[in-house]
Amino acid sequence: MKIERVSKRRLKIDIFLLIPILLISLIGIVALLSTTITIDGSFGDTSIITKQLIFLASGFILFFLFSFLDISILRMWQIVLPIYLVTVALLILVLIFGPVVNNVQRWLVVGGIQIQPSEIAKVTVILTTATVLSYKDRYNEWLLFFVSLLLTLPMVILIYMQPSGSMSILTLSIWFLVAFTGLNNQLRNSVILLIIGLITSAFLFITVTGNWYYILLSVVGLIFALFAFNYRDTWKIFVIGALVVSILLGSFSTILYSNILKEYQRGRIETFINPTQDTQDLGFNVNQARIAIGSGQIFGKGFGNGTQSKRNFLPEHQTDFIFASFAEEFGLVGSLFLLAMFGIIIIKGLIASINNVNNPFFAMLLVGITMKILLEVFINIGTNTGTIPATGIPLPLVSAGGSITVMTLFSLGLIQSIMNVSQKDKNKGKIIDNYEFIN
């Protein structure tokens, strides 16, 4: 089968998707440019700006290229399997040939260009999971659920071995959201998820804090379990399974925290619970970010006038903590504008997924890409504000970085392509069968 171009008559670029992308990219360049200004007001090394512009140009080429193509072919295993195998191979090569930077191996250097395969893996997980679950009309959905998990775990484990605990958790979370979307009976599944989440959280919080008051979480979980067990007979087996899984996950989380997580990873969790007791170590970064954000007040200090990054009080101000640097100079107004632009993209993605309810593959692909961006934004800003433990997740299209910039724009190109294909099929009055492009 050939990839067909969307007819020129119906080819459109949604300005409500494109404009926020362009504005966020511009904000990223402005924020990065500001970080190059020295204390005396002059520009320092601006090579990072040149690199980021190249990454953006490359990403926009992919965005427009895939916007113009009918990507229905991506549901074929002849396409998906090679993508999956190449991604796994890249993750293995990182552990063998990747340079060690700050005691981690997360990049491959090819022709002087650094590639971060874990960013590719996030998109591969979305594509693979959407493809597997699109067979749910032919096979048992729970069988497909676990097949998709088995395909995802090698990538998650390889990412964790770099080591990158936060990225491995993010990748697993993306898988779960896509797979969860692909299952039927969302009410039942949501209740089951709530039960597992509450009981597992109780195990983890008691382990970390030693405070047995968190057992109340498990009590609430058991109340929901009792309600669900008596709600419908068909739910009973799922409730029993949820309780078993909760105990297993809770026990595993305790073992994971106590015996598997590295000291710095445990430290991040403990610092998150009480960052003020660690202002000179792991909590220092978060507290400095909070100071930067708070000092920006309503309208900010103005371009190039931030003090936290200029005086090197704010670490990683071009990557992990660029939001704090931006908020210091552009204040609450600038921060809300940036969040609004991300919000428009996320809403567009979710609306598109609803419009593709008759095409499970497209719907799951849209949910996966949208949730990927939402999680990245939430985690990065949550780290900057101290809402969640410190991680190394950059802010898409804003933080400096080639892999995340290119893969984000590529993913957004897939959203635009699906919107074009969906509109074309809608105009034809056509309902797409899950397997139309498989055989």
Regions found by a protein language model. Name each.
Residues 20-23, 29-31, 39-281, 328-383, ...:
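Hydrophobic alpha-helical transmembrane segments of multi-pass inner membrane proteins, especially
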Residues 9-11, 145, 311, 357-358:
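Helix-boundary and loop/linker segments of multi-pass membrane transporters
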Residues 1-11, 42:
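Cytosolic juxtamembrane amphipathic/interface segments immediately preceding
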Residues 268-319, 330-334:
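TM-adjacent membrane-interface loops and short helices in multi-pass inner/ER membrane proteins
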Residues 134, 283-291, 295, 405-415:
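Hydrophobic alpha-helical transmembrane segments
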